[in-house]
């Protein structure tokens, strides 16, 4: 067999494969054996029908075509390996020459991974927010903790902002009660504004047993946007009493003996949280910088598949929450065209980011050891609410394990870039990121062999940060022509 490669574009190549007839004989013989078992001919036992009889019954051309189709996947695979083609899509195969006794010539066009030229890692510079925790932020957290230990005490007075009330609610539009708009004994914090617009103004000043009515605009349902008359009856008023901020409160609400120790712990936790956020910001800005500096073409088939996958996930999400696409777009304040353009841009960035990180993995020979893989498997199992062994079995049934390995490798590549990049805050002061410690790569792990070609979907819709890795691997050739 002879294979040659022609580059059609940075992301697509054309293989031309020439196969002597002698190399097709094993496939031809296998086809005869298979047909001999399938075809029933009087006077011959199953599996014993001679090739010449099969030629007479089925036609030599039909048998040759089937033998070629049987041989194509293996021939294509050998050509890919011989020419070292990193395929990303199903090939488009065309048989350009074939005759009985003559050579087989076919072409296969396929999308490939583009070449990525990486910049010097030390040249990368990003700016992140400085880690700052103010006294006001500490007191805000302390106030939230204090609020959790508040006591609700019944009072006999008019409703005030901050009170907790028990309400009976009903609503009607044009004199007709609205289905599902009734509630009794509903607990509500006055002034929170998280129930019905206009409710706070209506019930402030009311007393236990008093009924107030007001008009508001319906936000959902068939009558969304229409006015509705709401009736609210107060069935009880409770005042929130906060505990005193002292050492006794610190002892009750935490493991600390003094209020100063509790404040110090809150500050430490806030700083840790800000440092974690700082790392996340650095990751995003580093990827943005790489996307600006590195030109990475995206194969059309890969982009189309990623967009389709995102649209499918979005449809499932909308169905789950009980809404439709027009309503969702209205919530976003986007037209169909604007949303589609944003999805397309986001999908393209996701694919380009993965190509860049994969290039870093190859360039730096980043590997993954069993401990790292198990750590991530356990973490994700916990997030999914299943046992690690069950989660591992679920991954093993599909491409999940390969996807997990690719995700871990890319995360390690990103952290390696952050370790080498120049990171400063808004004032230009160098920032030392709180990066996780990197374990030494497993010298036996070969990243190029440990992963398939995968693409991370950043979100169901633009802005969603939960990425899903979906493998894209070579598949058997489909012919669109014959000899």
Swiss-Prot record:
Gene3D superfamilies: 3.10.50.40, Trigger factor ribosome-binding domain, Trigger factor, C-terminal domain. The keyword Cytoplasm applies. It holds the Pfam family Trigger_C. Keywords: Cell cycle, Cell division, Chaperone, Cytoplasm, Isomerase, Rotamase. Its EC number is 5.2.1.8. GO terms for molecular function: peptidyl-prolyl cis-trans isomerase activity; protein folding chaperone; ribosome binding. InterPro entries: PPIase_dom_sf, PPIase_FKBP_dom, Trig_fac, Trigger_fac_C, Trigger_fac_C_sf, Trigger_fac_ribosome-bd_bac, Trigger_fac_ribosome-bd_sf, Trigger_fact/SurA_dom_sf. GO terms for biological process: 'de novo' cotranslational protein folding; cell division; chaperone-mediated protein folding; protein transport; protein unfolding. GO terms for cellular component: cytoplasm. Residues 473-483 have a biased composition (Acidic residues). It is an enzyme of class 5 (isomerase). Its main location: cytoplasm. PROSITE patterns: FKBP_PPIASE (PS50059). It is found in: Cytoplasm. It catalyses: [protein]-peptidylproline (omega=180) = [protein]-peptidylproline (omega=0). Residues 162-243 form the PPIase FKBP-type domain. Residues 459-483 are annotated as: Disordered. Involved in protein export. Acts as a chaperone by maintaining the newly synthesized protein in an open conformation. Functions as a peptidyl-prolyl cis-trans isomerase. Consists of 3 domains; the N-terminus binds the ribosome, the middle domain has PPIase activity, while the C-terminus has intrinsic chaperone activity on its own. Belongs to the FKBP-type PPIase family. Tig subfamily. This is Trigger factor.
